[in-house]
Amino acid sequence: MEEYDYSDVKPLPIETDLQDELCRIMYTEDYKRLMGLARALISLNELSPRALQLTAEIIDVAPAFYTIWNYRFNIVRHMMSESEDTVLYLNKELDWLDEVTLNNPKNYQIWSYRQSLLKLHPSPSFKRELPILKLMIDDDSKNYHVWSYRKWCCLFFSDFQHELAYASDLIETDIYNNSAWTHRMFYWVNAKDVISKVELADELQFIMDKIQLVPQNISPWTYLRGFQELFHDRLQWDSKVVDFATTFIGDVLSLPIGSPEDLPEIESSYALEFLAYHWGADPCTRDNAVKAYSLLAIKYDPIRKNLWHHKINNLN
């Protein structure tokens, strides 16, 4: 704040000073001064370097203040138009934003602001965004805001070349990382028209290998189902996938449905759920689906028994 003079600005009040307020917020004097100055400058529509500095000070103490983010964007857009080098100016703004991002990993205003800056940028670069994205996901591999922004970047730049390998690395690190599995599916959905049969076969093997490592992991089973549905018109894997899934349920389908105590343990309830869904799509195998859902309700996933009964009723 020392760099700029605000003595000509009369701060506007941020408190009502009404009688008998139910819960008066105890603002610090510094906070009231910052917000009062901001209100005054916004009312004057001042788009200046000192206004930009003020927004940085406020974001430092109140990083979720959407109005200030919007005001900062208006300032940046105006000052960019007066800059001799708009690329350099916006890159400096992105550098500042990187620091704010690292200190506020759960702040969602940051990401919409980044999007607005990239849309404004004459020559935006996905390569420039990758380091900050990696740092943020390394810090919290399930940070929803970061994953959403990464998806946005892929679509904005029409660039998916890094995504499959990146998702693979994260899955190798943590096979339960559902965010990485979801991002992997995002890649296939957007690249499906340029994928070869060999690549599809390799991906199917990748999925089965990961299931083999941890059969009772819902993420790859859900992914397998989505992958099969996405490419059902290009490859016929039904028998291979069914044979693979049945290796995790033993001979439970050949046994009479009795009490839970009489039924054996199986390696994966998610394999049984996958098979039930698969069999339910074919009238010739619906009896198998009904039995699989019944087994899930009775023994292998009773916490969701109402769901399994609902699915049985739909089949019947």
UniProtKB/Swiss-Prot annotation:
Q: Name one Pfam family in it.
A: PPTA
CC cofactor = Mg(2+)
Could you tell me the keywords of this UniProt record?
Cytoplasm, Magnesium, Prenyltransferase, Repeat, Transferase
Annotated PFTA repeat ranges: 47-81, 89-123, 125-159, 160-193, 199-233
**SUPFAM superfamilies of this UniProt entry?**
Protein prenylyltransferase
InterPro entries from the xrefs?
A: Prenyl_trans_a (IPR002088)
Q: Give me the reactions it catalyses.
A: L-cysteinyl-[protein] + (2E,6E)-farnesyl diphosphate = S-(2E,6E)-farnesyl-L-cysteinyl-[protein] + diphosphate; geranylgeranyl diphosphate + L-cysteinyl-[protein] = S-geranylgeranyl-L-cysteinyl-[protein] + diphosphate
Enzyme Commission number(s): 2.5.1.58, 2.5.1.59
Respond yes or no to whether keyword Magnesium is given for this record: yes
Q: Where in the cell is it found?
A: Cytoplasm
Q: Which GO terms of the molecular function aspect are on file?
A: CAAX-protein geranylgeranyltransferase activity; protein farnesyltransferase activity; protein geranylgeranyltransferase activity
A single cellular component GO annotation: CAAX-protein geranylgeranyltransferase complex
User: What's a GO biological-process term for it?
Assistant: peptide pheromone maturation
Indicate the impact reported for D140N: Decreases catalytic activity 5-fold, but retains substrate binding properties
Miscellaneous comment as given in the Swiss-Prot or TrEMBL entry: Present with 396 molecules/cell in log phase SD medium.
**Role this protein plays:** Essential subunit of both the farnesyltransferase and the geranylgeranyltransferase complex. Contributes to the transfer of a farnesyl or geranylgeranyl moiety from farnesyl or geranylgeranyl diphosphate to a cysteine at the fourth position from the C-terminus of several proteins having the C-terminal sequence Cys-aliphatic-aliphatic-X. If X is Ser, Ala, Met, Cys, or Gln, then the protein is farnesylated, if X is Leu or Phe, then the protein is geranylgeranylated. The alpha subunit wraps partly around the beta subunit forming part of the active site.
Q: Note the subunit structure.
A: Farnesyltransferase and geranyl-geranyltransferase share a common alpha subunit (RAM2). Protein farnesyltransferase is a heterodimer of alpha subunit RAM2 and beta subunit RAM1. Protein geranyl-geranyltransferase type-1 is a heterodimer of alpha subunit RAM2 and beta subunit CDC43.
Instruction: Provide the family line.
Output: Belongs to the protein prenyltransferase subunit alpha family.
Name it. Protein farnesyltransferase/geranylgeranyltransferase type-1 subunit alpha
List the source organism. Saccharomyces cerevisiae (strain ATCC 204508 / S288c)
Q: Which gene encodes it?
A: RAM2
